[in-house]
Amino acid sequence: MGPVYVSGYLALYDRDGGELALTREIVAAALPPAGPLPINIDHRPRCDIGAVLAVVDDDRGPFFLGVVNCPQLGAVLARAVGPDFFGDMRLSDEERLLYLLSNYLPSASLSSRRLAPGEAPDETLFAHVALCVIGRRVGTIVVYDASPEAAVAPFRQLSARARSELLARAAESPDRERVWHMSEEALTRALLSTAVNNMLLRDRWELVAARRREAGVRGHTYLQATMWAGLLPKSGASPAPGPSAAMAAPPSAAPGDYIFVPAAQYNQLVVNQRPAPSLESQLGAIVSAAMDRRHRRSPSPEPRPPARKRRYDDYAQDNAYYPGEAPPPASDLAAVVSSLQREISHLRAQQLRYPTPYYAPAAPPQLLPPGAVVGHPHPHHAAGALYPPMYAPQPGLHAPPPSPVAHAVPALPGLPGLQGLAAPVAHVPAQVVPQQPVVVQAQPVAVPAAAAAAPAPAPAAAAAAAAPVQAAAPAAPASAPQPPVQASVSAPADVSAGTIDASSAAVACQRGADIFVSQMMSQR
């Protein structure tokens, strides 16, 4: 296994503050360093795995190029990696080491000597460079590759002057062919320490991606910066110039491999995949937020001496003074709300028991023949009086089922021609009785003179006579066939007391549920 080259910015000018700040004057005084700068793992002593070949002063900050050549490092990482980490990628040992180093130690950290008050920096300011997970300075991301040119190429904002000077000094460095040997036990401890010390680092890969953008790295091959386990195939990695470019040739797309959809439609599909939280969860979150705000607003209670009988008068304290005296937690309220929601669901399910009655579709309306009489007789109208013309019912139309509360009543006094009329009984509510006039095919009924001259009927009789009635058609001659009497359904809402409209039931259940919830919540 040959050497691995690493490069990157040690700092960016005017981007850090405090003791991490490096100005152009300090860097100019510290370069070139008095001796070779070792490269170790996470600033651990006696854990050198390489050395810095050259450091140049770029317009953006100090930039270094180093070499890592430790055979034991590749052996330890190769034994630690899982068998499925590389997937189906057929890689050499050198490429495996490049992938592991790029994603396990993607940053660099410059260690410098702390200056005394009034001390001027000199060539001994820089101590060493450590490979780590996340550096404290801005833009300290590194790139590993098999050659110096390929390691420097992804830094697109590096000036041409600094690039050429860096490669020239690295070619003359005596440490380019040096090999560093360490015990595998010490390397294992150093790598494990790095993992343990950074296991609580929040948004690790987001920080790595941000540092990569700050350093101007584009076209890298081995740094994945992904949150998923395993490595992406080479077709997903961006190619880098140099010897590594031949390894990252993406396959050509075959017809039908991609589907192009608008961005708005894609975003809508992604949003719809997320299941909405349940109503109980939302209510529980609201209750918890309200309790949290109340705890924050309430001032801390003053210390008081313990009392023999002390009730929970401080809502900011959730601890119980005596068994059974703890304030009710917010989970109880959430349980009550869940119970109320189950009651509402039960009430809404009642509408399934009363389906909406079905009526056959009516034929296009037609006008009555000229000789037909439309309307129904009324005791206060003269004989032969007619109502305004209306549309006649068509064959095949079905009327709503008869009301079970309607009963036959005897003939009304003074109206002998209305025998056998059906009228609602007195105990039926007014809103259940049909109020629309019933259209029938009938002949004009003549009212006798005695009935016309008779005094006005009693209020009860008048109310019964004013109610809508259904008059039977006069009997036709025996020779002519009698057409069936068809009822009109001009008012589909005309239903009996035994049939409940589904929409009405839903409204009634909804109102009842709302009243029930409001009463229960007011008591809580």
Swiss-Prot record:
Keywords: Host cytoplasm, Host nucleus, Hydrolase, Phosphoprotein, Protease, Serine protease, Viral capsid assembly, Viral release from host cell. The keyword Phosphoprotein applies. The record marks A225, T226, A502, S503 as: Cleavage. GO terms for cellular component: host cell cytoplasm; host cell nucleus. Residues 289-311 are annotated as: Disordered. GO terms for molecular function: identical protein binding; serine-type endopeptidase activity. The active site is at H43, S109, H128. Residues 256-275 are annotated as: Interaction with pAP. InterPro entries: Herpes_virus_sf, Peptidase_S21. GO terms for biological process: nuclear capsid assembly; proteolysis; viral release from host cell. Its EC number is 3.4.21.97. It comes from the Viruses. Belongs to the herpesviridae capsid scaffolding protein family. Region of interaction between pPR and pAP is called Amino conserved domain (ACD). The region of interaction with major capsid protein is called carboxyl conserved domain (CCD). This is Capsid scaffolding protein.
